[in-house]
Protein backbone atom coordinates (compact mmCIF):
# COMPACT_ATOMS: atom_id res chain seq x y z
CA UNK A 1 0.00 0.00 0.00
CA UNK A 2 1.44 3.37 -1.06
CA UNK A 3 2.32 5.78 1.76
CA UNK A 4 3.21 9.50 1.68
CA UNK A 5 6.94 10.17 1.70
CA UNK A 6 8.31 11.27 5.07
CA UNK A 7 11.79 12.21 6.29
CA UNK A 8 13.70 9.17 7.55
CA UNK A 9 13.79 10.58 11.09
CA UNK A 10 10.03 11.36 11.22
CA UNK A 11 8.32 10.05 14.33
CA UNK A 12 4.83 10.75 15.63
CA UNK A 13 2.59 13.69 14.76
CA UNK A 14 3.82 16.68 12.83
CA UNK A 15 2.45 20.11 12.00
CA UNK A 16 -0.11 20.07 9.21
CA UNK A 17 0.60 22.36 6.29
CA UNK A 18 -1.41 23.19 3.20
CA UNK A 19 -0.42 21.41 0.02
CA UNK A 20 1.22 18.48 1.81
CA UNK A 21 -0.44 15.09 2.31
CA UNK A 22 -0.47 14.56 6.07
CA UNK A 23 0.50 11.09 7.30
CA UNK A 24 1.18 10.18 10.91
CA UNK A 25 3.04 6.87 11.40
CA UNK A 26 2.35 7.03 15.15
CA UNK A 27 -1.33 6.28 14.39
CA UNK A 28 -0.58 2.91 12.74
CA UNK A 29 -1.75 1.03 15.84
CA UNK A 30 -4.94 3.08 15.96
CA UNK A 31 -5.70 2.22 12.34
CA UNK A 32 -5.06 -1.47 13.03
CA UNK A 33 -7.45 -1.44 15.98
CA UNK A 34 -10.04 0.27 13.77
CA UNK A 35 -9.87 -2.58 11.25
CA UNK A 36 -10.21 -5.20 14.00
CA UNK A 37 -13.10 -3.38 15.65
CA UNK A 38 -14.87 -2.97 12.31
CA UNK A 39 -14.72 -6.73 11.81
CA UNK A 40 -16.01 -7.39 15.33
CA UNK A 41 -18.90 -4.95 14.88
CA UNK A 42 -19.91 -6.56 11.60
CA UNK A 43 -19.72 -10.08 12.99
CA UNK A 44 -21.81 -9.05 16.01
CA UNK A 45 -24.51 -7.48 13.85
CA UNK A 46 -24.01 -3.94 15.15
CA UNK A 47 -24.13 -2.44 11.65
CA UNK A 48 -27.23 -4.07 10.19
CA UNK A 49 -27.54 -6.48 7.28
CA UNK A 50 -27.24 -4.24 4.23
CA UNK A 51 -24.74 -1.75 2.86
CA UNK A 52 -22.58 -0.21 5.59
CA UNK A 53 -22.02 3.50 5.03
CA UNK A 54 -18.71 4.39 6.66
CA UNK A 55 -17.05 7.78 6.87
CA UNK A 56 -13.37 8.49 7.52
CA UNK A 57 -13.48 12.14 8.56
CA UNK A 58 -10.43 14.42 8.43
CA UNK A 59 -8.87 11.64 6.42
CA UNK A 60 -5.60 13.19 5.13
CA UNK A 61 -3.99 10.21 3.33
CA UNK A 62 -7.19 8.16 3.41
CA UNK A 63 -5.21 5.27 4.81
CA UNK A 64 -7.72 4.26 7.48
CA UNK A 65 -10.59 3.76 5.02
CA UNK A 66 -8.30 2.08 2.51
CA UNK A 67 -7.22 -0.39 5.19
CA UNK A 68 -10.89 -1.20 5.90
CA UNK A 69 -11.34 -2.13 2.24
CA UNK A 70 -7.98 -3.89 1.87
CA UNK A 71 -7.74 -5.90 5.08
CA UNK A 72 -11.27 -6.92 6.01
CA UNK A 73 -12.58 -10.25 4.63
CA UNK A 74 -14.34 -10.00 1.28
CA UNK A 75 -17.75 -10.82 2.76
CA UNK A 76 -17.37 -7.72 4.96
CA UNK A 77 -15.52 -5.28 2.69
CA UNK A 78 -17.98 -5.93 -0.15
CA UNK A 79 -20.73 -4.41 2.00
CA UNK A 80 -18.80 -1.22 2.81
CA UNK A 81 -19.40 2.07 1.04
CA UNK A 82 -16.61 4.25 2.44
CA UNK A 83 -16.34 8.02 2.14
CA UNK A 84 -13.15 9.92 2.93
CA UNK A 85 -13.42 13.60 3.86
CA UNK A 86 -10.78 16.32 3.86
CA UNK A 87 -10.47 20.04 3.21
CA UNK A 88 -7.33 19.57 1.11
CA UNK A 89 -7.79 18.66 -2.56
CA UNK A 90 -4.21 17.36 -2.70
CA UNK A 91 -4.94 14.81 0.02
CA UNK A 92 -8.03 13.46 -1.72
CA UNK A 93 -6.30 13.36 -5.12
CA UNK A 94 -3.43 11.41 -3.57
CA UNK A 95 -5.79 8.99 -1.82
CA UNK A 96 -7.76 8.38 -5.02
CA UNK A 97 -4.64 7.73 -7.09
CA UNK A 98 -3.22 5.44 -4.42
CA UNK A 99 -6.49 3.49 -4.22
CA UNK A 100 -6.52 3.15 -8.01
CA UNK A 101 -2.88 2.05 -8.20
CA UNK A 102 -3.18 -0.36 -5.27
CA UNK A 103 -6.83 -1.52 -5.19
CA UNK A 104 -8.11 -4.09 -2.68
CA UNK A 105 -6.77 -7.54 -3.54
CA UNK A 106 -10.29 -8.96 -3.80
CA UNK A 107 -11.38 -6.11 -6.07
CA UNK A 108 -14.37 -5.09 -3.96
CA UNK A 109 -15.20 -2.13 -1.75
CA UNK A 110 -16.45 1.33 -2.69
CA UNK A 111 -14.38 4.46 -1.93
CA UNK A 112 -15.92 7.92 -2.37
CA UNK A 113 -14.39 11.34 -1.65
CA UNK A 114 -15.82 14.54 -0.20
CA UNK A 115 -13.83 17.77 -0.21
CA UNK A 116 -15.05 20.15 2.45
CA UNK A 117 -15.99 20.48 6.09
CA UNK A 118 -16.59 17.22 7.96
CA UNK A 119 -19.73 18.68 9.54
CA UNK A 120 -21.28 19.19 6.11
CA UNK A 121 -20.22 15.73 4.97
CA UNK A 122 -21.81 13.83 7.84
CA UNK A 123 -25.10 15.69 7.53
CA UNK A 124 -25.35 14.89 3.83
CA UNK A 125 -26.26 11.25 4.50
CA UNK A 126 -26.83 8.74 7.30
CA UNK A 127 -23.85 6.67 8.46
CA UNK A 128 -23.28 3.36 10.22
CA UNK A 129 -19.63 4.07 11.03
CA UNK A 130 -17.96 7.43 11.63
CA UNK A 131 -14.31 7.99 12.47
CA UNK A 132 -13.28 11.42 13.78
CA UNK A 133 -9.53 11.89 14.07
CA UNK A 134 -8.79 15.63 14.23
CA UNK A 135 -5.63 17.59 14.81
CA UNK A 136 -6.66 18.88 18.25
CA UNK A 137 -10.07 18.63 19.91
CA UNK A 138 -12.95 16.63 18.39
CA UNK A 139 -15.52 18.79 20.21
CA UNK A 140 -16.64 20.84 17.16
CA UNK A 141 -17.58 17.72 15.17
CA UNK A 142 -19.46 15.47 17.60
CA UNK A 143 -22.93 17.06 17.42
CA UNK A 144 -23.33 16.90 13.65
CA UNK A 145 -21.79 13.41 13.51
CA UNK A 146 -24.22 12.14 16.14
CA UNK A 147 -27.19 13.49 14.19
CA UNK A 148 -26.21 11.44 11.14
CA UNK A 149 -25.79 8.09 12.91
CA UNK A 150 -27.98 5.16 11.91
CA UNK A 151 -30.24 3.49 14.47
CA UNK A 152 -27.31 1.24 15.34
CA UNK A 153 -23.76 2.14 14.46
CA UNK A 154 -20.25 2.74 15.72
CA UNK A 155 -18.31 5.96 16.20
CA UNK A 156 -14.60 6.32 16.93
CA UNK A 157 -13.26 9.63 18.24
CA UNK A 158 -9.64 10.69 18.78
CA UNK A 159 -8.38 13.73 20.68
CA UNK A 160 -4.86 15.14 20.66
CA UNK A 161 -5.63 18.02 23.03
CA UNK A 162 -4.36 15.87 25.88
CA UNK A 163 -3.10 18.86 27.87
CA UNK A 164 -6.71 19.94 28.25
CA UNK A 165 -8.24 16.50 28.82
CA UNK A 166 -5.69 15.52 31.47
CA UNK A 167 -6.17 18.72 33.44
CA UNK A 168 -2.90 20.49 32.62
CA UNK A 169 -4.81 23.21 30.75
CA UNK A 170 -7.77 23.72 33.05
CA UNK A 171 -9.40 26.62 31.20
CA UNK A 172 -9.35 24.77 27.86
CA UNK A 173 -10.79 21.69 29.56
CA UNK A 174 -13.67 23.69 31.01
CA UNK A 175 -14.36 25.56 27.75
CA UNK A 176 -14.37 22.51 25.50
CA UNK A 177 -15.68 19.77 27.77
CA UNK A 178 -17.27 21.48 30.79
CA UNK A 179 -15.28 19.43 33.28
CA UNK A 180 -12.24 19.40 35.51
CA UNK A 181 -9.59 16.69 35.89
CA UNK A 182 -7.10 16.18 38.68
CA UNK A 183 -3.59 15.96 37.21
CA UNK A 184 -2.36 12.67 38.66
CA UNK A 185 -1.61 9.07 37.66
CA UNK A 186 -5.26 8.61 36.65
CA UNK A 187 -5.46 11.74 34.50
CA UNK A 188 -5.48 9.97 31.12
CA UNK A 189 -8.21 7.58 32.22
CA UNK A 190 -10.16 10.55 33.58
CA UNK A 191 -9.66 12.35 30.26
CA UNK A 192 -11.16 9.45 28.31
CA UNK A 193 -14.08 9.37 30.73
CA UNK A 194 -14.63 13.10 30.24
CA UNK A 195 -14.78 12.47 26.48
CA UNK A 196 -17.35 9.70 26.94
CA UNK A 197 -19.42 11.87 29.28
CA UNK A 198 -19.53 14.76 26.80
CA UNK A 199 -20.33 12.47 23.88
CA UNK A 200 -23.08 10.68 25.82
CA UNK A 201 -24.74 14.01 26.63
CA UNK A 202 -24.74 14.96 22.96
CA UNK A 203 -26.11 11.53 22.03
CA UNK A 204 -28.97 11.92 24.52
CA UNK A 205 -30.10 15.15 22.80
CA UNK A 206 -30.96 13.03 19.77
CA UNK A 207 -32.54 10.13 21.71
CA UNK A 208 -29.40 8.04 21.44
CA UNK A 209 -27.21 6.22 23.94
CA UNK A 210 -23.61 5.08 23.73
CA UNK A 211 -22.04 1.76 24.72
CA UNK A 212 -18.22 1.99 25.00
CA UNK A 213 -16.33 -0.71 23.11
CA UNK A 214 -12.70 0.40 23.52
CA UNK A 215 -10.90 3.33 25.16
CA UNK A 216 -7.19 3.86 24.60
CA UNK A 217 -4.46 6.25 25.67
CA UNK A 218 -1.72 5.85 23.08
CA UNK A 219 1.27 8.18 23.11
CA UNK A 220 0.03 11.63 22.04
CA UNK A 221 -3.70 10.97 21.85
CA UNK A 222 -6.78 9.62 23.59
CA UNK A 223 -9.31 7.59 21.61
CA UNK A 224 -12.75 6.24 22.47
CA UNK A 225 -14.77 3.81 20.35
CA UNK A 226 -18.42 3.15 21.12
CA UNK A 227 -21.65 1.80 19.74
CA UNK A 228 -24.46 4.32 19.19
CA UNK A 229 -28.02 3.04 19.59
CA UNK A 230 -31.28 4.90 18.97
CA UNK A 231 -33.18 4.44 22.25
CA UNK A 232 -35.20 7.00 24.18
CA UNK A 233 -35.30 4.83 27.29
CA UNK A 234 -31.51 4.38 27.33
CA UNK A 235 -30.99 8.08 26.65
CA UNK A 236 -33.19 8.84 29.66
CA UNK A 237 -30.76 6.87 31.84
CA UNK A 238 -27.91 9.22 30.95
CA UNK A 239 -27.27 10.51 34.48
CA UNK A 240 -26.85 6.97 35.81
CA UNK A 241 -23.62 6.71 33.80
CA UNK A 242 -22.16 10.13 34.64
CA UNK A 243 -20.64 11.20 37.94
CA UNK A 244 -17.43 12.05 39.75
CA UNK A 245 -14.03 10.58 40.52
CA UNK A 246 -12.62 11.42 43.95
CA UNK A 247 -8.95 10.93 44.76
CA UNK A 248 -8.06 9.84 48.31
CA UNK A 249 -11.74 9.50 49.30
CA UNK A 250 -13.07 9.78 52.82
CA UNK A 251 -14.98 6.94 54.50
CA UNK A 252 -18.38 8.45 53.78
CA UNK A 253 -17.47 8.88 50.10
CA UNK A 254 -16.35 5.26 49.82
CA UNK A 255 -19.56 4.14 51.54
CA UNK A 256 -21.64 6.15 49.04
CA UNK A 257 -19.68 4.63 46.16
CA UNK A 258 -20.32 1.11 47.49
CA UNK A 259 -24.01 1.85 48.02
CA UNK A 260 -24.24 3.03 44.40
CA UNK A 261 -22.63 -0.15 43.09
CA UNK A 262 -19.57 1.74 41.85
CA UNK A 263 -17.07 0.31 44.33
CA UNK A 264 -16.48 -3.26 45.49
CA UNK A 265 -16.69 -3.68 49.24
CA UNK A 266 -13.42 -5.21 50.41
CA UNK A 267 -13.67 -4.75 54.18
CA UNK A 268 -10.87 -3.59 56.42
CA UNK A 269 -9.78 -0.06 57.24
CA UNK A 270 -7.68 0.60 54.13
CA UNK A 271 -9.41 3.08 51.83
CA UNK A 272 -9.00 2.89 48.03
CA UNK A 273 -6.82 5.33 46.11
CA UNK A 274 -9.92 6.71 44.40
CA UNK A 275 -13.63 6.02 44.00
CA UNK A 276 -16.47 6.91 41.66
CA UNK A 277 -19.55 8.75 42.89
CA UNK A 278 -22.95 9.29 41.23
CA UNK A 279 -23.79 12.65 39.71
CA UNK A 280 -26.24 13.51 42.49
CA UNK A 281 -23.63 13.14 45.23
CA UNK A 282 -22.98 16.60 46.76
CA UNK A 283 -19.32 17.09 45.83
CA UNK A 284 -17.50 20.38 46.23
CA UNK A 285 -16.48 21.25 42.68
CA UNK A 286 -13.63 23.37 44.02
CA UNK A 287 -12.19 20.37 45.89
CA UNK A 288 -8.86 19.54 44.18
CA UNK A 289 -9.53 15.83 44.78
CA UNK A 290 -12.55 15.84 42.45
CA UNK A 291 -12.59 15.12 38.70
CA UNK A 292 -15.70 15.35 36.54
CA UNK A 293 -18.36 15.24 35.48
CA UNK A 294 -17.14 12.10 33.75
CA UNK A 295 -18.26 8.66 32.62
CA UNK A 296 -18.50 6.25 35.57
CA UNK A 297 -19.54 3.16 33.61
CA UNK A 298 -17.33 0.64 31.78
CA UNK A 299 -14.95 2.18 29.23
CA UNK A 300 -14.81 -0.94 27.08
CA UNK A 301 -16.55 -4.15 26.07
CA UNK A 302 -15.00 -7.51 26.92
CA UNK A 303 -16.03 -9.10 23.63
CA UNK A 304 -14.66 -6.24 21.54
CA UNK A 305 -11.34 -6.27 23.36
CA UNK A 306 -11.08 -10.07 23.21
CA UNK A 307 -11.55 -9.91 19.43
CA UNK A 308 -8.29 -7.95 19.21
CA UNK A 309 -6.25 -10.46 21.20
CA UNK A 310 -3.95 -13.05 19.69
CA UNK A 311 -5.03 -16.63 20.30
Regions inferred by a protein language model and the residue ranges of each:
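SAM-dependent transferase fold signal centered on methyltransferase-like domains
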Residues: 1-311
Amino acid sequence: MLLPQLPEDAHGPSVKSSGVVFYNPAMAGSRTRSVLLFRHAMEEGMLGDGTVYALDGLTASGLRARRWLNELPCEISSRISATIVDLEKESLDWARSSHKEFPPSDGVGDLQTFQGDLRAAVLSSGRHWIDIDPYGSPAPFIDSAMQSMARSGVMEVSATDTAALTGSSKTALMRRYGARVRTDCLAHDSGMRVMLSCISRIAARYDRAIEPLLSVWDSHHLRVSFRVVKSVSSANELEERIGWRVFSPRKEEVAASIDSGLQVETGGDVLPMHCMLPLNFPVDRKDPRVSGPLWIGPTGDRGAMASMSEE
